[in-house]
C-alpha cells in the first residue's frame, strides 16, 4: 500500500505537513507539488469577500463543527488502479492540499482500488467530503455496510453564479451557514442531458434550519458582480441524483418501464487524458497540469454489449451482466449497493429504484462489465443479510421477456380449457393467444435523449428480443394512427417486422412514414388474400367513354400499375355489395356503385374489402362518375351482369408514369363547363389535377386563385421530376414530409391521416403545386376531408 503526501507550493504549510507526517509515520515522503489554478484562486477570493461582508453585517454565525466528521481522515474507494497518487491528488484533491494518500492497488484487472485519504485539517476533510464527485467515493465510516449520515434538509438550488465558480467556491460561499453534505455545481439539466456549467449549483445542508438561514441571507446577494438566487430545489434531477450511481466512463443501464436510460452518461476523461475539457471550468476534475495517462478501461467498456442469453433454469432470456436485487432494506441507497458489490468486479451502474416520492421500492439493479463478475456476485450475495434484511439476487430478466413468459403461461392455461369446451379451429386459437399475449406487452423500445427510437441500441440486441420490442411498439402505435381492426393487427405487425431495421426505426420516428408503411402492409396482405380468390376468364370491354377511366385515374400510386384481371365472382360481388351498403347513405345507387367497384382489378377489389378507407374512396369516385352520367344523359356505367354471371372488367389502365405528367398539359373528361363560376369551396371539391389545369387555362382570371409565381412552379416541377424512377413509397414519402408540415400549420387534427389520404387520392405533381402555389385551395380541401371524417 503506497503512502504519499501531496502539497501546494506553500513553504510553511509544507513544513507543517511534513512535521505532522513525521510524527505519524517516519517513512512518509513527498512525491509531487500541485498548485491551485488562477481561476480557482479568483473565485475563492470572491467568496471570501462575500463571506466577510456578511460577517461584518452580523448575518453569519460562527461556523459550527461537522455533526458526523470527527477526524481529518476519510475512506476512499472507486479509484482506478492505474491512476497514480500524483494524478489523484491533482485531479480530485487539488482544492484541499496537502493530503496523505494510502491506496491499496493490489486488485484484480478491471477492479477499482481503495484506501484512505488524510487531510491537514478537519475543515479540509469536510470540504472534500462535500465536493468530491463520483467515480471517487468518500466515506466517513470504514465499514461499507454502515449507512452514511443523511441530511435532513431539503436541497437548495443556487442560480446566477459567476461563470468561474466551481464546487470549492460554492462550498466556501455557503459553509459559514452550517455543515454541508453536498455542494456541487450542476453540469446537467433536469432531463439528464449534459450541458456544462450554466451558473447553477445544488446544496444539501445537514440541518433544515441552516438551509433556511442560508436561503434567507444569500438570496439576491451579489457574488462576483452577479445577483444570485437561492431557493428549494423542486426539480427531479435524474443525472444529478444518480451521479454517484454511475461510473462516468460506463454506459448507463436503467431497466425501468422503458429500456431506454433516463439519463445518458458521459465520459469526463477524453482519450489519452484524465482532465476534462478546459471549457468546463466548473468541474472539479479541471486542472491545468494533469499529465495524460492511458486508460485501459474505456476500450473494454465501449466494446460490443453482451447479448441476452437463454437460461434453462428460468426458461427465458436473461441479461448475464446485470443483477436484480430485491428485498432491500428501505434505508439502503444506491451508494450502499455500489459499495457492497464493488468487490466482485467493475460495476457499470448500481441503482436502488424509488417511487415518485423518493421512497425506496426495496429492489434495485447492479450491472457488471462481464458475466463472470455478475455470476460471482450472485453466488456470494444471494440470501446474504444486507442491513436488516436478507436480499434475493437473480440475473436480470428483461421486462419484455418476463411479461411474454407470463403471457405464454396464461395462454397455455386458456388453451387447455378451450380444448375441453370448444372445437374452434387451431389457427383461430393461435391468433387469439397472440393477441392476449400482447396485453402483457408493455416494454418500450430503446430511445435516445430526444425520445427518438435508437437504432444502434436496437441493433445491439438479439434478433428475438429486437423483434419482440418492435412488435410491442408497433402494436401500441398502429391503432392510434390507423383504422386497422383487431383482427388485422397481428398480420399488419407481422408485415412491418419484415422491414429492414432502418426502415422500421424510421416508421417509429416519423408518423407519416408509419402510416405509409401500414398502408403498404395492408396492400401486401390484400394481394396475398386476392391470390386465393378464384376469378372467371376476363371478357373484353372497349373504352368508348374515357370518363369511365376516372375511377382508375384517382387510384393510389402503389396500385396504378396493376394489370386488368378477371371480374368479381358472384360471391365476391355479394361481399362488395355489403361493404358498399355499410359506407353509403340510404338511397344511394349501391348496385351501380358495386358494379363499378367490381370492375376494378382483383388487387383493388381485395383492398376495398380489406381497407375501409380505400373502399370509401372508391365509392366516392364511383358516385362522382354516376353524377356526371346523370348530367350528360349518357350511361357510362359498365353493363350489369345478369344474376349468376360476373361483371365485365375494364381493360384499360392508367400507367404509373401518369402521376408525373404535368397537370397543365392533361385534359380532364370530367371537367365542368368553362362558363361555370367557381368559389374556393367548389374548387377544393375538384381533383388537384383539375384545379391546376383550370389555374393554367386562359379563363383562369375569374377563379379565386392567386397567380402562381413562375419560380415556385419551376421549383415544384423540378422536385417532382427528381422523384421519377423512385419507388412509389419513396415518392410519397418525400412529398409527404413537406405536405405533412404544411397541413399541420392549418391547425387541424389528424394531420398524418389527412396527408396519407391526399397522397393516395391525388396526382402527386398537382398536389405539390397546390401545396406551394395555391395554399388556400389546399387548406379548403383539407377542411373538406375533415368534414368527411377522414382525419379520424
Swiss-Prot record:
Domain PABC residue range list: 715-792
Recorded consequence of changing residue 751 to G: Leads to a reduction of RNA-binding
SMART domains per UniProt: RRM
Domain RRM residue range list: 72-145, 154-235, 321-398
Compartment(s): Cytoplasm, Cytoskeleton; Endosome
Phenotype of the disrupted gene, per the record: Reduces filamentous growth and virulence. Disturbs polar growth of filaments.
Record keyword Transport present: yes
Alphabetized GO MF terms: mRNA 3'-UTR binding; poly(A) binding; poly(U) RNA binding
Chain intervals for the UniProt region annotation (Disordered): 37-60, 412-438, 630-649
A Pfam entry, by short name: RRM_1
SUPFAM superfamilies: PABC (PABP) domain, RNA-binding domain, RBD
One annotated GO biological process: mRNA transport
GO cellular component: cytoplasmic stress granule; cytoskeleton; cytosol; endosome; nucleus; ribonucleoprotein complex
Composition skew (Low complexity), residue ranges: 412-424
Alphabetized UniProt keyword annotations: Cytoplasm, Cytoskeleton, Endosome, mRNA transport, Repeat, RNA-binding, Transport
Description of its domains: The RRM1, RRM3 and PABC domains are important for RNA_binding and polar growth. RRM3 recognizes the specific binding motif UAUG of cargo mRNAs.
UniProt function note: Key RNA-binding protein involved in the formation of polar-growing hyphae which is essential for infection by the plant pathogen. During filamentation, assembles into particles that shuttle bidirectionally along microtubules to both poles. The RRM4 transport particles are part of the endosomal mRNP transport that regulates polarity of the infectious hyphae by transporting distinct mRNAs encoding, for example, the ubiquitin fusion protein UBI1, the small G protein RHO3, or the septin CDC3, from the nucleus to cell poles.
Name listed for the protein in its UniProt record: RNA-binding protein RRM4
Lineage of the species this protein comes from: Eukaryota, Fungi, Dikarya, Basidiomycota, Ustilaginomycotina
